């Protein structure tokens, strides 16, 4: 097997694995949002605190997805 083709194949495989971070972040954000909506429906007076915590948690979750996307792009374009 050509070494250059092997490296390209492994880079594509690594990019696919790194892109899985986006799936995990999406699932996590969806679960957190669902639980926040349940919490607000149970206790409407705490909606401000629940929503601020949700926004901070979602930011951290989406940061993981962005890091995975950046790594995948680096592997695809071999920067």
Curated annotation (Swiss-Prot):
GO molecular function, one term: proton-transporting ATP synthase activity, rotational mechanism
Superkingdom per UniProt: Bacteria
Pfam family, one: ATP-synt_C
Cited PROSITE patterns: ATPASE_C
Regions that span the bilayer: 7-27, 56-76
Swiss-Prot/TrEMBL GO biological process terms: proton motive force-driven ATP synthesis
Localization, UniProt: Cell membrane
Alphabetical keyword list: ATP synthesis, Cell membrane, CF(0), Hydrogen ion transport, Ion transport, Lipid-binding, Membrane, Transmembrane, Transmembrane helix, Transport
InterPro entries named among the record's database cross-references: ATP_synth_csu_bac/chlpt, ATP_synth_F0_csu, ATP_synth_F0_csu_DDCD_BS, ATP_synth_F0_csu_sf, ATPase_proteolipid_c-like_dom, F/V-ATP_Csub_sf
Lipid bilayer topology: Multi-pass membrane protein
Feature type site, description Reversibly protonated during proton transport: 62
GO cellular component: plasma membrane; proton-transporting ATP synthase complex; proton-transporting two-sector ATPase complex, proton-transporting domain
CDD domains: ATP-synt_Fo_c_NaATPase (cd18184)
Coiled-coil residue spans: none
Subunit relationships: F-type ATPases have 2 components, F(1) - the catalytic core - and F(0) - the membrane proton channel. F(1) has five subunits: alpha(3), beta(3), gamma(1), delta(1), epsilon(1). F(0) has three main subunits: a(1), b(2) and c(10-14). The alpha and beta chains form an alternating ring which encloses part of the gamma chain. F(1) is attached to F(0) by a central stalk formed by the gamma and epsilon chains, while a peripheral stalk is formed by the delta and b chains.
HAMAP family for this protein: ATP_synth_c_bact (MF_01396)
Family from the record: Belongs to the ATPase C chain family.
The protein's role, per its UniProt record: F(1)F(0) ATP synthase produces ATP from ADP in the presence of a proton or sodium gradient. F-type ATPases consist of two structural domains, F(1) containing the extramembraneous catalytic core and F(0) containing the membrane proton channel, linked together by a central stalk and a peripheral stalk. During catalysis, ATP synthesis in the catalytic domain of F(1) is coupled via a rotary mechanism of the central stalk subunits to proton translocation.
Protein name: ATP synthase subunit c
């Amino acid at each position: 097997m050509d070494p250059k083709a092997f490296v390209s194949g492994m880079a594509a495989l690594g990019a696919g694995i790194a892109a899985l971070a986006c799936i995990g972040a999406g699932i996590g954000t969806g679960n957190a949002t669902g639980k926040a909506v349940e919490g607000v429906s149970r206790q409407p007076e705490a909606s401000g605190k629940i929503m601020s915590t949700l926004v901070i948690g979602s930011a951290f979750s989406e940061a993981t997805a962005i890091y995975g996307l950046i790594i995948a792009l680096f592997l695809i374009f071999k920067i």
